[in-house]
Amino acid sequence: MAPQRKRQDGACKKTCPIPAPVPRLLVKGGVEVLEVRTGPDAITQIEAYLNPRMGNNIPSEDLYGYSNSINTAFSKASDTPNKDTLPCYSVAVIKLPLLNEDMTCDTILMWEAVSVKTEVVGISSLVNLHQGGKYIYGSSSGCVPVQGTTYHMFAVGGEPLELQGLVASSTATYPDDVVAIKNMKPGNQGLDPKAKALLDKDGKYPVEVWCPDPSKNENTRYYGSFTGGATTPPVMQFTNSVTTVLLDENGVGPLCKGDKLFLSCADIAGVHTNYSETQVWRGLPRYFNVTLRKRIVKNPYPVSSLLNSFFSGLMPQIQGQPMEGVSGQVEEVRIFEGTEGLPGDPDLNRYVDKFCQHQTVLPVSNDM
């Protein structure tokens, strides 16, 4: 009888495939989920959307998402646009959970925006050619679709978006209901470094007056595109598979100061032409999916400054006579440091020059 073959241990043992590691979902839900305390390596995703602010900004209005009919000036001197004809920026603030209980450490945790998925929602609604409006050919044809000038912009940051003012016509008079450049002059038709603002109000900053400031916004990432023309067809893409990385060349994303995330956008799809050939702006909402992580950073707030701000906040606010500025009533301030020999002239004029050297001004002779 032939000897039996030896069984090799483990030769026929099957191994189960190992799944690829992916982030483990801890919890999901509404904004109340942000109150859940998570570990230092936790990643948070926030989904939000911003509605357009074209002029009719109340959801119950019939023209919600549109502006009113654009009123065109007969001359530069009579350029007075109405508030409900001015597309404005949309903005929102999302309050994030407090990360630090002890602010006296040399390092603290801050929320860092890492990436964002975003897209304009409702592009398919522009296919509508039966809602009423100017006919393409005749009464038996469809109406002219939304077309013309388009503007798309969004921003994600740890601070409000910083704006630079620049207008097409400095003689335009904007209504008080919106934020415009104060005391506009011809220089505002170019870059005036004094025309600055913070995007701190929703639906108040007209797109035609303000744009993101390229010299600022170190803690914000913004993106935009513009297509001009009277009959230019709108061209927009939509997908849920494109991620925009918010990290800079140093691998750092926007750090959310005060544990707040700022979202802003403006999406003008074009103009709709009515039967009477008046035109209204059409805006669309934008969806955001922002990924945040916790980042260890050096504490920028010294304990001494925190204590000073705390104690100064305990003092009552007094409205007194001016002690600072142009009308300040402080006559003189003297600072003494260390000791010196008794000077023979107590009225010597002393100062520290730009090289940090102590200088003494010699007295002027009274001899004529």
Curated annotation (Swiss-Prot):
It is found in: Virion; Host nucleus. The keyword Transcription regulation does not apply. It comes from the Viruses. GO terms for biological process: endocytosis involved in viral entry into host cell; virion attachment to host cell. Keywords: Capsid protein, Disulfide bond, Host nucleus, Host-virus interaction, Late protein, Phosphoprotein, T=7 icosahedral capsid protein, Viral attachment to host cell, Viral penetration into host cytoplasm, Virion, Virus endocytosis by host, Virus entry into host cell. GO terms for molecular function: structural molecule activity. Signal peptide: none annotated. Residues 303-368 are annotated as: C-terminal arm. InterPro entries: Capsid_VP1_Polyomavir, dsDNA_vir_gr_I_capsid, Polyomavir_VP1_sf. A motif (Bipartite nuclear localization signal) lies at residues 5-14. The keyword Phosphoprotein applies. GO terms for cellular component: host cell nucleus; T=7 icosahedral viral capsid. The modification Phosphothreonine is found at T339. Homomultimer; disulfide-linked. The virus capsid is composed of 72 icosahedral units, each one composed of five disulfide-linked copies of VP1. Interacts with minor capsid proteins VP2 and VP3. A DNA-binding domain overlapping a bipartite nuclear localization signal is present in the N-terminal region of the protein and is required for efficient virus formation. The intrinsically disordered C-terminal arm interacts with neighboring pentamers. The unstructured nature of this region allows to make different interactions depending on the structural context: pentamers present at the 12 icosahedral fivefold axes bind five pentamers, whereas pentamers present at the 60 icosahedral six-fold axes interact with six pentamers. Forms an icosahedral capsid with a T=7 symmetry and a 40 nm diameter. The capsid is composed of 72 pentamers linked to each other by disulfide bonds and associated with VP2 or VP3 proteins. Interacts with a N-linked glycoprotein containing sialic acids on the cell surface to provide virion attachment to target cell. Once attached, the virion is internalized by endocytosis and traffics to the endoplasmic reticulum. Inside the endoplasmic reticulum, the protein folding machinery isomerizes VP1 interpentamer disulfide bonds, thereby triggering initial uncoating. Belongs to the polyomaviruses coat protein VP1 family. This is Major capsid protein VP1. It comes from B-lymphotropic polyomavirus (LPV).
